[in-house]
Curated annotation (Swiss-Prot):
Lineage of source species: Eukaryota, Metazoa, Ecdysozoa, Arthropoda, Hexapoda
GO biological process: DNA recombination; DNA repair; DNA-templated transcription; negative regulation of DNA-templated transcription; regulation of development, heterochronic; regulation of gene expression
Organism from which the protein derives: Drosophila melanogaster
Domain DBINO, residue spans: 313-438
Protein known as: Chromatin-remodeling ATPase INO80
Assigned GO CC terms: chromatin; Ino80 complex; nucleus; polytene chromosome
Gene field: Ino80
Residue spans of biased composition, Low complexity class: 1505-1534, 1618-1627
């Protein structure tokens, strides 16, 4: 009986399958089959009879299999296998193919085919009609069947190798082949029993005779699926095994064993028949080899036996098979009934569903009708509301248009006022120009025409402007102002008689009768005769201009460039007044302290006729000088004094004495000293009684337009009387243009020039003086040393973005000024690092800690027994000395009395030691031992010399005594020039060498650089022979490069080119690195030059013993003179590398090498001194000047020093010495003290060690050398550290230096007011700010928020809960805690909130952020809360002078007496800040512009505190305004007062009583329900209950702006240009009234 064929699975690679439990787990978790089944079930109709038919077929197949006997088993299995193949190819093919891939069916045997069916079968659903008892019976039958199958399975010995029954189906190969062979082995074929043979013959007899099989020699090899394994039972013998009943619904155990009983009866029946005839046939032996034929004997049955057997079989079938078929029929009937019931239930379900749907449709029809009715009603209501809103909108637009007209008229009125004032000023200047002979009637008409403007027909009813009336009024005011000036001037005039009559006639004439055509051109006045000197042409023109404005009673500003002789022109003008008008004073000259002596010298030099009083000195000296102020004979030549020269400080201190005299003329030198109109100096000098004022300033406009106004108001108080108006005229627009914010009005600038023209005269050097030498300015970029880099990096790492933002977000002027001072301290620390690191910490001399050891007394016994037991006074002298074996007598007897070779002292003959030498070495102590060693060392060189030169002499006994002489490496044996001496380390250490080892190193070949070529060319250029060599090379047509150095001149616009011939470049030939083997290597100095930490003096010993005293004396004297000499020489050899002194004095070279600037300066000064130049070195820090002084001492440069601490008398002498003595090489000056008024033309080189904030200060300093009288070319070197804060400071200075081109010649500028944000931009550049910002954001995002903080935040900010019906349950107030007793509207509640709440900070577009300060030292900061999403912009001005920023004293720092040197101490109290990554209104699920507690167009206006009202309000965006409004309203439990607020957002100006509904936490009015059910329309939007706050969609803002403004400051931004900024509401908004900007 052959095994049925099994379909072979798809071939796939042989690999170990996954374990069964993992496969089941993956199958259980795989949702794809479930989804596919769901799709199929949804697509398939509800009634399908295919599955039931298949189930009936399967059951019938099972029944037929049970009913057939063993002879039909193979046929049934063949049918099942064919059906199995059809099932695999049916609709379940995909699932069975997947299952087939999970198992290995290659070695499937017949006894495990049922397992194949089980694995590939689908799981059947339970029968719904089966009862619980039937289910239990079925479980029991399955259990019995399982036991029987297990028993039959293990009967085969081949199956013992498997761990479980399914083994072999889970893997493609057997991993325990050895165990399989050991278990199964080679089995013999089992012989069949007679009963088996009988049963086989009966089966063959029923089948009928078969044709004999023919031999097939070439039969193909059987398939692997049908061939049994070794030790496995072949499929033909499976009949003898009983596998039990496989029907699923067996009812009892008797039926299970029916097949076995049936076979037994057949066997017993066959034994009763007689023997049949035997037939021999040739058949193939199963399991044999191919072609093997055996003979089998078979017995043929007779007809009677067959008939009896047939009868027996029919009886059995009638008894047992009929009942079984009946049961099958009943089961089929039951299943049919169950299917019918199931179909009936489904039909009822469908009908019921249709009924429900019809009912729902009926209900929805009524509901839809109602909803349509509501929608129609809502539509018409909405139509009426829209119509009403449209009407209101038109009315509101008309009202707004009326307001805009009123505002436009007001703006025009302000513009007309400013225009009128400017026109009046221009008209006044025109009248003055006419008096000077420069104006015309056309200019007057042009000026008056500026008051005309076009009329607007729409505004004609409200605008009453009359241009003609304004022209008359402006002309009258200008005439009145000029008349007042004339009257004031006339009161001071005391002329000669010939001039008095002309003055009276001029006074009677009115201003209107001024001749329109005065002198067509001013003629230059002659040089005064009393002036002892020669004026240049431009100086005479300047004196003439001064005389003309003096005639007209006008004060002026002589603003010639520095170095053009303003002092000489003013002195010549004073001589002209005295000579032409007969007015000899009194004249008051006020100048800085450094130029007082210069004025006195110039006066005595050029005008010796003037009586000059130098008013300075001590109070007693000044009191004596005031005695000469006799007011008799004033204005005459016989007066006691004509000119008083004093300083600004003395004028302020002695103001009461100066104000008693009516000065004829007051000259203020370096007038920028009164640039601040708020200073006491400016106010006191303005109150002086004088006829005219003259201001001398090389830089009249240094920083801002306010300084220009201060100077103009000082010379003409009646005209420029309003600082605010002047600021409105020019300052705001020009400064905005300078900061690249707005465009510049060229017409406005031209009008400003027109105003300044009569009062100011300015010439520059290149226009008036062609004889002045050139000036070259060179920027020298210096690198930072390692020490500077470490300090600079450490300072930078301590800067935090939050700290800078906290400093830049001050709310008051006081906090802003303190923030600016703190930031300036940071800047000063960086500048110190760039100048020299020793400004922080000096390298002082270090010495070890000196300590004295404890002194104690030694008992006599210890001293005698332990120390002097070998000396003569000792009692044990005989024991230690007399009886010693090294005694001379004993050694003598041992050697010579009885010559004994074995004597213990026989080695002395080989060592060249005598008896006395032996005693000295052993008994006389260390001194004698060292002396003996010294003698031996002196003898070795002699022996080596004798051995080296006396070659013919035979070897002496020293060969035996000194065998080391034969060593070739002996130091004494080596020649003097031997290289081997380098390997003797003792020689190197004795010579204080740092060689510590020998090793290998490499040298690499590199190409020559241009610097090396320049150095070689400069050296060769000095020798004529080398120049000739260069000419020879040029003749050979070699390429010679040239380096061109272009120098720009300030006096001339040409360019000089100097050529330096360079030597030919060395040809570069790449070579391999050269290796040096076994070369001495030096040790780093830090390893052998370390200073001691502790040093102790030698200990003194005391003992009550005379012998101890004698031994100490002998020890101190080293026994004898030879011992002293030996000790001194030994100490000399033992001298350390750095000497015996333990004090470590820093090397002066480190002073140079520690700073990159000083290192560059050292090389520069060396070159300048070699070329014969003289140098001025400027620095702002006096401590830096101290370091430069130390450097000058170190380099032996002769120098002088002048700074703010120098006395006035000493300054004069120092300047005179430097001008006259040529041996003084360097003049060290402070930029502020030594940069004004002094003449240092003896120097031709100026070096700025550090640059000033103000470029004009540096310009004045360099003009001390580049001025009249300078004959050499002036070179200016400016030392700048590359990549540091100095580069940004220099860039700012360059922008500020263009102010003169803006105001005087046209241009732009930067103001000098250092605001905190600008100082931050100096500290960090754009990349560093962005990098620090990203790092901080990354740290904040990565840091986990504690659970307690999250729970607390959720408690304070609960989210809104929205139910399905549409009712919105509002969140409680974020600021009011139900557990607190304090009301949320009080200030105490706000303080509690600020102390506990942690919120994020959102940064706006303008990059200005504000933080919540919790420091108790700043109450103004702690009382203001900040709304997330809002940005604080504060307009603060710091009107401070530069002297407050850089102190020119002993210390350059900004710290007070009690302040620490740590510049970050003020930043320690800054609270941590967080940044909101998602601004409100931009998160998912919320519309743009909306917030958590309000919409985009919030209706609640913001309430500002008086602190906020101090600064102009800036309109905010809709989202930020809503956030601010809702934040203020959420914490208010009562309605706000009915006050209008301007600038509160979109609804500014709306009374607060209309917005009371917003004040409740839920946003609804109290007592009104707003629930809306399904289908109900929304409430009317016009009511306050559900008024929408959602605005129109707008573009998203950038998420990550920079925190610090770089290009411009938001403080000066007009409100209309910064829509993204808004002020944060005050915590007291619920209790205080609203205050808006006026």
């Amino acid at each position: 009986m052959e095994a049925k064929p099994v379909p072979a699975p798809q071939p796939r690679p042989r690999a170990m399958a996954e374990p069964l439990h993992i496969q089941r787990l993956e199958a259980a978790l795989n949702m794809r089959p479930f989804m596919n089944m769901a799709k199929r079930s949804l697509r398939k109709p509800l009634s399908s009879d295919e599955e039931t038919d298949d189930e009936h077929v399967v059951k019938r197949e099972h029944d037929v299999q049970d009913s057939d006997d063993s002879s039909t088993v193979g046929v049934v299995r063949m049918k099942q296998s064919s059906k199995r193949k059809s099932r695999l190819l049916a609709s379940k093919e995909e699932r069975q193919s997947v299952k087939a891939q999970l198992y290995n069916f290659n070695d499937l045997t017949s006894d495990r085919e049922w397992l194949y069916d089980l694995l590939l079968s689908d799981t059947e659903s339970d029968d719904p009609t089966i009862t619980e008892d039937e289910y239990v019976q079925q479980l029991l039958r399955e259990h019995v069947r399982e036991q029987r199958q297990r028993k039959n399975y293990y009967k085969k010995a081949a199956n013992a190798q498997y761990a479980y029954y399914g083994s072999g189906l889970l893997s493609n190969h057997d991993i325990f082949a050895e165990r399989q062979l050991a278990t199964a082995g080679v089995r013999k074929r089992r012989r069949r029993t007679k009963q088996e043979i009988l049963m086989a013959r009966l089966a063959e007899a029923q089948a009928g005779p078969k044709p004999p099989k023919q031999r097939r020699r070439g039969r193909k090899k059987r398939d692997n699926m049908g061939s049994p394994e070794s030790g496995e039972v072949p499929p033909s013998e499976l009949g003898k095994y009983t596998f039990g009943d496989t029907l699923p619904n067996n009812e009892d155990d008797d039926e299970d064993g029916g097949e076995v009983d049936y076979k037994r009866e057949l066997a017993s029946l066959a034994l009763d028949y007689p023997e049949e005839e035997e037939i021999e046939e040739e058949v193939d032996v199963e399991g044999g080899t191919e072609g093997q034929v055996t003979k089998v004997r078979r017995k043929r049955k007779n007809p009677a036996a067959l008939a009896a057997r047939r009868r027996r079989i029919w009886q059995i079938m009638s008894k047992k098979e009929s009942g079984r078929l009946q049961r099958i029929k009943s089961n089929n009937h039951k299943e049919m009934l169950a299917n019918c019931k199931r179909v009936a239930g489904m039909c009822a379900k469908v009908v019921r569903q249709r009924a429900i749907n019809s009912q729902r449709i009926m209900k929805e029809t009524v509901w839809r009708a109602k909803r349509l009715t509501r929608e129609m009603l809502a539509y018409w209501k909405r139509y009426e509301r829209v119509e009403r809103d449209q009407r209101r909108k038109q009315e509101r637009e008309a009202e707004e248009q009326r307001k805009q007209d009123v505002e436009l008229i007001e703006v025009k009125r302000q513009q007309r006022k400013l225009n009128f004032l400017i026109t009046q000023t221009e008209l006044y200047a025109h009248f003055m120009s006419k008096k000077l002979g420069q104006g015309s009637e056309e200019d007057q008409l042009r000026i008056l025409s500026q008051l005309d403007e076009e009329t607007n027909a729409r505004l004609a009813a409200q605008d009453d402007y009359d241009a003609g009336e304004m022209k008359l009024l402006a002309q009258e005011n200008a005439e009145a102002a000029m008349q007042r000036d004339l009257d004031k001037t006339r009161a001071f005039d005391v002329f000669a008689k010939k001039k008095e009559k002309e003055e009276e006639e001029q006074a009677q004439e009115s201003v209107e009768d001024i001749k329109p055509e005065p002198r067509p051109e001013m003629k230059d006045l002659p040089q005064p005769k009393m002036f002892k000197g020669t004026l240049k042409g431009y100086q005479i023109k300047g004196m003439t201009w001064l005389a003309n404005i003096y005639d007209q009673g006008i004060s002026g500003i002589l603003a010639d460039e520095m170095g053009l002789g303003k002092t000489v022109q003013s002195i010549a003008f004073l001589c002209h007044i005295a000579e032409h008008y007969g007015v000899w004073g009194p004249f008051l000259v006020i100048s800085p302290a450094s130029t007082l002596h210069n004025w006195q010298q110039e006066m005595s030099r050029f005008v010796p006729d003037f009586k000059v009083v130098p008013y300075w000195g001590s109070p007693a000296e000044r009191k004596i000088l005031r005695q000469f102020w006799d007011q008799k004979h004033l204005h005459t030549r016989d007066a006691s004094f004509h000119v008083v020269i004093t300083s600004y400080q003395l004028v302020v201190s002695d103001y009461k004495y100066f104000n008693r005299i009516k000065w004829q003329y007051m000259v203020l030198d370096e007038a920028q000293a009164i640039k601040s109109a708020a200073s006491q100096r400016w106010k006191l000098l303005l109150g002086f009684s004088c006829r005219n004022r003259l201001l001398l300033s090389g830089t009249p406009i240094q920083n801002s337009m306010a300084e220009l106004w201060a100077l103009l108001h000082f010379i003409m108080p009646t005209l420029f009387d309003s600082h605010d108006e002047f600021n409105e005229w020019f300052s705001k627009d020009i400064e905005s243009h300078a900061e690249n914010k707005t465009g510049i009005d060229e017409k406005q600038i031209s009008r400003l020039h027109m105003i300044l023209k009569p009062f100011m005269l300015r010439r520059i050097k290149k226009d008036v003086e062609n004889e002045l030498s050139d000036k070259i300015e060179i920027m020298v970029y210096c690198p930072l040393t390692i020490r500077q880099k470490l300090l600079y990096r450490a300072l930078k790492q301590k800067i935090r973005i939050e700290d800078l933002l906290h400093l830049t977000s001050g709310s008051t002027t006081t906090s802003s000024s303190s923030s600016a001072s703190n930031l300036m301290n940071l800047v000063m620390q960086f500048r110190k690092v760039c100048n020299h690191p020793e400004l922080f910490e000096r390298r002082d001399a270090r010495s070890p800690f000196f300590m004295r050891c404890a002194e104690y007394t030694i008992p006599r016994l210890i001293h005698e027994e332990g120390l002097i037991h070998r000396m003569l006074p000792s009692r044990k002298h005989l024991l230690y000395n007399r009886f010693n074996i090294f005694k001379s007598e004993y050694i003598q007897r041992s050697l010579f009395e009885d010559v004994n070779v074995n004597s213990c002292f026989g080695f002395t003959r080989l060592c060249d030691l005598s008896v006395g030498d032996m005693v000295e070495v052993t008994l006389n102590g260390l001194i004698d031992f060292l002396l003996h060693y010294r003698r031996v060392l002196e003898k070795y060189p002699l022996l080596a010399y004798r051995r080296f030169w006396w070659k013919k002499q035979p070897d002496s006994r020293y060969q035996l005594l000194e065998p080391m002489l034969e060593n070739k490496l002996a130091l004494d044996y080596m020649p003097p020039n031997s290289v081997l001496k380098n390997f003797i380390f003792t020689a190197m250490t004795a010579n204080e060498s740092s060689v510590y080892a020998f090793g290998d190193y490499f040298t690499y070949n590199m190409q020559e650089t241009i610097e090396h070529r320049v150095i070689r060319s400069k050296i060769l250029k000095k020798k004529t022979s080398l120049i000739e060599e260069m000419e020879d090379v040029s003749k050979q047509k070699l390429e010679i490069e040239s380096v061109e150095v272009q120098t720009k001149s300030n006096a001339k616009s040409d360019v000089k080119v100097t050529t330096l011939l360079l030597l030919p470049e060395f040809p570069h030939r790449p070579r391999k690195p050269r290796k040096y083997v076994c070369e001495p290597l030096s040790m780093p100095r830090i390893l052998y030059d370390l200073g001691q930490k502790v040093q102790a003096v030698h200990r003194y010993l005391y003992c009550d013993s005379r012998s101890a005293a004698w031994s100490q004396i002998r020890h101190n004297q080293c026994e004898n003179s030879q011992g002293r000499e030996l000790v001194s020489s030994g100490l000399a050899l033992c001298k350390p590398h750095g000497g015996w002194s333990s004090i470590v004095v820093p090397d002066k070279e480190t002073l140079i090498t520690d700073a990159g600037k000083l290192f560059v300066l050292d090389n520069l000064l060396t070159r300048l001194k070699a070329n014969g130049h003289r140098v001025l070195i400027y620095s702002q820090m006096t401590k830096m000047i101290d370091l430069l002084e130390e450097y000058m001492w170190h380099r032996k440069h002769r120098y002088m020093r002048l700074d703010g601490s120098s006395k006035i008398s000493a300054r004069r002498d120092m300047v005179a010495d430097f001008q006259t003595r040529a041996d003084i090489f360097v003049f060290l000056l402070s930029t502020r003290a030594g940069g004004l008024g002094i003449n240092l033309t003896a120097a031709d080189t100026v070096i700025f060690y550090d640059s000033d904030w103000n470029p004009t200060v540096d310009q004045q300093a360099m003009d001390r050398a580049h001025r009249l009288g300078q004959t050499k070319q002036v070179t200016v070197y400016r030392l700048i550290c590359k990549g540091t804060i100095e580069e940004r400071i220099l860039q700012r200075a360059r922008e500020k230096s263009e102010i003169q081109r803006m105001v005087i010649s046209g241009g732009n500028f930067k103001p000098d007011t250092l605001k905190p944000k600008e100082v931050v931009s100096l500290l960090l550049d754009d990349e560093e700010i962005e990098m620090k910002y990203r790092q901080e954001a990354k740290l904040q995002s990565s840091s986990p928020i504690p659970a307690a903080t999250q729970s607390e935040r959720k408690r304070r900010h609960p989210q809104k809960d929205v139910n399905m019906g549409g009712t919105t349950i509002a969140a409680t107030s974020a600021t009011q805690n139900p557990d607190d007793d304090v009301p949320s509207c009080s200030s105490a509640a706000k303080r509690i909130k600020l102390e506990t709440e942690e919120d994020f900070i959102d940064v706006g577009i303008t990059s200005s952020a504000s933080s919540v300060g919790t420091d108790s030292n700043h109450p103004t900061l702690s009382q203001e809360t900040y709304v997330p999403g809002a940005t604080c912009v504060q307009q603060t001005e710091i009107d401070s002078e530069n002297e407050a920023l850089v102190v020119d004293g002993d210390s350059p720092t900004m710290l007070g007496q009690n302040e620490s040197m740590n510049f970050l101490d003020d930043l320690s109290g800054i609270s941590p800040m967080r940044r909101r990554h998602h601004p409100r209104g931009t998160r998912r699920g919320r519309p743009r512009g909306s917030t958590r507690r309000g919409g985009g167009h919030g209706s609640i206006p913001r309430v500002l505190t008086p602190t906020q009202a101090a600064t102009p309000a800036v309109p905010a965006t809709a989202s930020q305004a809503a956030a601010a409004g809702t934040g203020a309203a959420a914490g208010t439990s009562s309605p706000l007062p009915q006050q209008e607020v301007s600038g509160g957002g979109d609804n500014a100006g709306v009374p607060l009583h209309e917005e009371e509904y917003r004040t409740s936490p839920s946003g609804q009015s109290p007592g009104v329900s707003c629930k809306r059910g399904p289908g109900r329309p929304r409430s009317k939007t016009a009511t306050p209950i559900s008024r929408g706050t959602r605005g129109a969609p707008r573009a998203r803002r950038p998420m990550g702006p920079l925190l610090v403004p770089l290009g411009r400051s938001p403080d000066d931004t007009p409100p209309s240009s910064s829509p993204a900024t808004s002020r944060a509401p005050s915590p007291l908004s619920g209790s205080h009234g609203a205050v808006g900007p006026e």
